Structure formats: C-alpha cells, structure tokens
A protein has these predicted regions:
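Conserved HGGG/HGGXW glycine-rich cap/lid loop of the alpha/beta-hydrolase fold
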Residues: 53-102
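Active-site loop/oxyanion-hole signature of alpha/beta-hydrolase fold enzymes
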Residues: 43, 51-57, 97-135, 151, ...
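Conserved alpha/beta-hydrolase catalytic His-Asp/Glu region
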Residues: 29, 189-255
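Short beta-strand/loop motif that positions the catalytic acidic residue
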Residues: 256, 262-264, 268
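Alpha/beta-hydrolase fold catalytic core
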Residues: 1-63, 87-90, 247, 315-319
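Flexible "cap/lid" loop of the alpha/beta hydrolase fold
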Residues: 149, 157-188
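Catalytic histidine-centered segment of alpha/beta-hydrolase-like enzymes
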Residues: 270, 294-307
C-alpha cells in the first residue's frame, strides 16, 4: 500500500512539473502593458482593449464599422482590412476579447452572454447609439449573430468571414481535454500543439501585399502568451460557448432581414466550406464570396480580396 501511494505521489509530481513550468512565469496583465495607440474601456466584467481608426480624406460618412475577431487571434488580425474601410469614410473600432490580446482575463465563464455583453458594453462605453456595421471572423461570426439577435436595432449590416457554427463536435478522446483539472493541465502542457507554432495558418504563402506573413503573425500572436488567463479563457470558451452548431441562431437572423455578407474559403480546414450552404438555408438573402484557394486564414492571407468585397457591401448599405 505504501509503495502504491509513493508511486502515485511521484506520478503526480511528474505530471505537475510541466504544468508548473508553463505557468510559473506568466504575468498578470495591467494597463502598463497595453500599446499606447489603444486604450482600456472599463466594462462590467473588467477592462477591455480597444482602438479607433479614423477615416481619411473628405469622404467621411459618419458610420462605424466594428471588427470582432475569432477564438484565439486578437485584433491585429484585421491589419490588412482597416485602411480600405477608412478610405471609404468609415470609422473603424477594433477590440480584443476578454482573455485575449491586451484585454484583462477575468475568471468567469466565457459563454456567449459574456461576448455579447462585452460588445454591447464597449459600444455604450464609447457612446455609440446609432446602428453599426458588424464584421465577425470565425468565432466572431456567432458573436455578431447573437449580438444582432439581442440588439437588432443596433445592427446595420453583418459581414461574416469563415463563421463558426458549422463544425463537427468534439467527441471521444478529444472531449476529455475539456474536463475539469484534466483540461487545465492538458491545455497548458500541450499549448504549442493546440495553438502554437505550426497551427497559426493553413496557408504557408500569400502574394497579397497586405497579408500578414508568418513571422509577423507569430510575433504579434505570442505577445498575449506571457499573461495569465489566456489559456483559461480559450478552455472556458470551448466549455461554455457552443461554436459547433449555431444554426438555430442563424435561422433567427434570417427572419430579421438585415443585410448580410459572408466570405468563405473553399479549402477551409477549420469551418468547412459546406457550411456556406447551411448558412444560405438559414439566411436566404446572404451575399456569398467564395475564395477558391482560400483556407480559414483568408482574413489575413487574402485581405485585399476579402476587404474589397466587404467594402463594396458596406458602401451599398450606407444610409
């Protein structure tokens, strides 16, 4: 019996050491860490990082575009699209979700209510009461959808890029990596396998001059990894936010008759292109852009094509 206890104790130590190695040097984010070109907005659940981009020239239309990023990659992912919208006279607001980028990492459930609440809270904080154009990438798609479902009078148009909500659910062995204790250990110890080097992009090369290359992407992505709470926010999102099947919500959106656009890569290995047919069934009036060689990273690998199409859609839906 004593031998068994010793073996169990040693095994627990062996398992704990890699977790300790991954977490012991993490910092708690504070205001001194955020880039000077952005700011923190104090919301109900904590401080969230945001940044404004102002329109250029004389063609200012007074309308606002809000960009909502996806699961793990924060707001820098929009770098190749922002100028196009500003040049057309739109004000552009970007922000990092709680747990990502330069926002705080509150210890709460990262469910759809949190993401909707934080978007509404940011708009209120910035005193935006008129309708806005919402653009959501990957997980940002369902966030746009659930927000619009709750606040249809605040949404002027919806643009979705490879939107989540049409994926196969985790099952079997994969489902165990979200269980209490096991999940925390696994997501920290095997972080590089989940979101690390080699999993950032499906596309190894892009000739788009506005694309974010792999080195630049990794440099910006890794800035958030030094802070406590990033991994926990991802794990909590997987546990609390159903990103696999959002068809009921999309069907409800179809009844609102709000102008909707979607861009999808035919070779998307994260949210399969077949989801575009499901989305058209839910929202019959949706405008679809198919990128033949596009994967899940079209937002930053083909930003010129995606940006021009969305910009045309936005201009056609101005007041």
């Amino acid at each position: 019996m004593n031998t068994l206890l010793i073996v169990i104790f040693v095994l627990l130590i062996v398992l704990y050491l890699p977790y300790l190695y991954k977490t012991i040097r993490l910092k708690k984010i504070n205001k001194s860490h955020i880039p000077e070109e952005g700011s923190w907005a104090e919301l109900e659940d904590g401080n969230i990082y945001y940044r404004w981009f102002e329109p250029e020239g004389e063609d200012v239309n007074g309308e606002t575009v809000v960009l909502i990023h996806g699961f793990s990659t924060p707001s820098f992912v929009w770098g190749g699209l922002i100028d196009k919208f500003c040049q057309s006279g739109f004000k552009v607001l970007v922000y990092d979700h709680f747990g990502r980028g330069f926002s705080e990492r509150p210890r709460i459930n990262y469910d759809k209510e949190l993401y909707v609440r934080s978007l509404k809270g940011l708009l209120d904080n910035q005193e935006i009461s008129q309708k806005v154009h919402l653009i959501g990438y990957s997980m940002g798609g369902p966030i746009v959808g659930y927000f619009t479902e709750n606040y249809p009078k605040l949404t002027k148009s919806m643009s979705l890029i490879a939107p989540a909500g049409f994926m196969q659910r985790m099952s079997g062995v994969n489902s165990w990596i979200t269980k209490p204790i096991i999940g925390e250990w696994f997501w920290h110890v095997f972080s590089n396998k989940i979101y690390g080097v080699g999993r950032m992009s499906e596309t190894s090369y892009s000739d788009d001059p506005l694309s974010i290359n792999e080195d630049e992407f990794l440099e910006n992505f890794n800035k958030q990894l030094i802070f406590k709470g990033f991994t926990e926010s991802l794990l909590s999102t997987v546990r609390c936010f159903n990103l696999f099947d959002c068809r009921r919500m999309y069907k409800d959106l179809g009844k609102l008759n709000i102008p909707t656009f979607v861009a999808w890569g035919k070779m998307d290995g994260v949210v399969p292109y077949s989801g575009s047919e499901n989305l058209k069934e839910c929202i019959p009036h949706v405008e679809l852009l198919t990128i033949e060689e596009g994967t899940h990273d079209i937002t930053y690998r083909q930003p010129t094509e995606v940006g021009e199409a969305i910009n045309k859609f936005l201009l056609s839906n101005r007041q």
